[in-house]
Amino acid sequence: MTDVDQTPADGLSASPRPADLTEHSRTGMGAAALQRAIADHLRYSIGRPAAALRPEHYYRALALAVRDRMQDRRVASTQTSLDLGRKVTCYLSAEFLMGPQLGNNLLNLRMEGAAKTALTAMGQNLDEVLACEPEPGLGNGGLGRLAACYLDSLATLERPAIGYGIRYEFGIFNQQIQDGWQVEKTDNWLVNGNPWEIAKPDVNYLVKWGGYAEHYTDEAGTERSRWVAGRLLKGVAYDTPVQGYGVNTCNVLTLWSARAVESFALEAFNTGDYYKAVEDEVTSETVTKVIYPNDEPEAGKRLRLLQQHFFVSCSLQHILHIMDDLADAGVRELPERFAVQLNDTHPAIAVAELLRLLIDERHLDWDEAWDITVATFGYTNHTLLPEALETWPLEMFSESLPRHLEIIYEINHRFLDEVRAKFPGDGDRLRRMSIIGEDGNKNVRMAHLATVGSHAINGVAALHSDLLKASVLKDFYEMWPERFSNKTNGVTPRRFLALANPGLRELLDRTVGDGWLTDLDRLRGLEPFVEDASFRQQWRDVKRNNKARLAKYVLSATGVELNPNWLFDIQVKRIHEYKRQHLNVLHIIALYHRLKQNPELSIPPRAFIFGGKAAPGYFMAKRIIKLINSVAETVNADPDVNKFIKVAFVPNFNVKNAHLVYPAANLSEQISTAGKEASGTGNMKFMINGALTIGTLDGANVEMRDEVGGENFFLFGLTEDEVQAVKAQGYCPSDYVDGNKELSAVLDLIARGTFSHGDTDVFMPLVDNLCYDDPFLVCADYASYVDCQDRVSAAWLDGESWTKMSILNTARSGKFSSDRAIAEYCDDIWQVWPLKVTV
């Protein structure tokens, strides 16, 4: 008798008759129970007639069935944490780029086989069902993906945690390419609902905005303050379970959605003012519509500030509400029960908001409230770029958050007194460290607020942390050296190796066992197999299959046909001048120029693949996308060239198609200007999948090169010290252009319209920027980069040697697991320990 009877394909017209009915359909982990659960959800949750069922309905039913099992663990995890009084990490982030969750949750629950068996019995294909899941639009790039990796690792390491963020209704935009230009389209990811989230309308908090601060004397004669709001809105919680791998721990991601306090004004409706009847609802819900509204206009800037305050206030009120429910703890024990981490500067207003809640609403005195606040918060800095260290115009801040500004002034006054005491007579230092910026128009420096209000500050790569201490936060490091540390970023090997690269996962499991899924250092066991010719061939077979898979996707998405036998050279990341996608393009044009000048020239065939989004208001980044696509159009259509090089820009790069991209790369482009990339995580995702890196000594590249060995890394470019020296001497990019005939010829090809149908205007801003400004030293690094690319081509010709280097990149990637990073945060900053959960 089979484990699961073969039911009709609709899954409804007859109930499955499993051989073993002992497992409950809501909680059972076997194929039989799962099949019953899917059938139940198809009937009772989806409610479609059998004849109308499609793969997307099976996706939703399977997701709901998997969520049931996660909720069982979620409730147990919460209860265990409360019963034992364990400390919980709260991770505040404006982004959580979770990616499709069904495959990841099946992996972590170890239910992939059960799901495949159950769906097959119902006439469905698991891969087709997985493909139906939309990409949740909750993040923009590396920051949000890091937050998602960290939630995965917290659960896998059995550390109690809550992620807090915003439930963006439309999220990041969908990117389309029209005539080579990026066009932003609405990302309507919630159009069919989200089966993973559970709405919690009873978990809601009022958030104030505008108005004024009022000072009064209470009945005991104590002077107090309160915030009289000009406007109120309500935040409603939506909970998504986050399952750890191979454990019962299931944490939660709580996202806040904005609602009107009174959604419908009946009086206005009855008088015929139909817009006024719903005006408050429309205005309030705008707050959580879109991630990172364009902050060029004043209204966009205000909306960004409101978004940040909104989710921070809801989150802190929720944390304090949990504290109130704990029988054995009061608000004064907050730092012993919760560690709150600020993921970059977006949640920095939390410092002032927690003080307000403790002083104005809980009536603690300043000193006690301040000690609690500093002991509760940790701050992760993710950038060295000045524009990303958020500041808010003082006038706007005062109008929006009047009580917070008063609190910040008091923080600043007391803080600067400390600075004066430690560094007497140093007025310049006071001006540099002040939370209130006095240069030009006054502003509130959010990175300074986060630094002053946190007991721990960390960078995200060794070089980045050193640069923070030496430049951006130098004065603060000299003030409190004990607060600073480094926590190099990491990525989850569950999603970005096991899930994204099933062929390599199978090979790794056969070779070193499956322990690497939770201990990535075990991949060191691959090193003896580097000299095994049979293993190297298996490695190449896996890589070629992954390249064929990506080539199929690229063809469908762009119409560009790629040969899987070619070198796949890939750069996928947010489009930004400091990431230097245009340096990559200059090399492609140089190859084009060489091939056109010398028809007898033969080079190793290479496919250049790009992906990434530009911020809607970022003029130069959008022009770089146009240049990539224009060069692709010219190169791909030229028979003299297209037998050696092809170029493709994959639109709408996201976690879902990243599963195809990272495993297929032979060469990973990590070519930012030294000193500009805090860490990077895409570099790590390529590395664990066996790509070789061409890169500068920037961000985590430095540590990756240390781990894999310089002989297995293609290094080029100025170091951070050399970048500073070049700038100090008065950098003149035209000197580099004039001194390099090929670079001059490449820029001339762009300027005279070779890639723009003769239009000499379209790329002139980019050419002028490189020749006369070049803030990210593209011209200075060009010769070194092109020479390094020639070394790449030479290395590619020796397939056996390249394969050895590829294996070693994977074998030596253990440091870059998010499990290692989270263990360091838990041990060094949060003091959050493992908690076994039983179900």
Can you describe what each PLM-predicted range is?
Residues 2-839:
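A conserved ligand/cofactor-binding region detector
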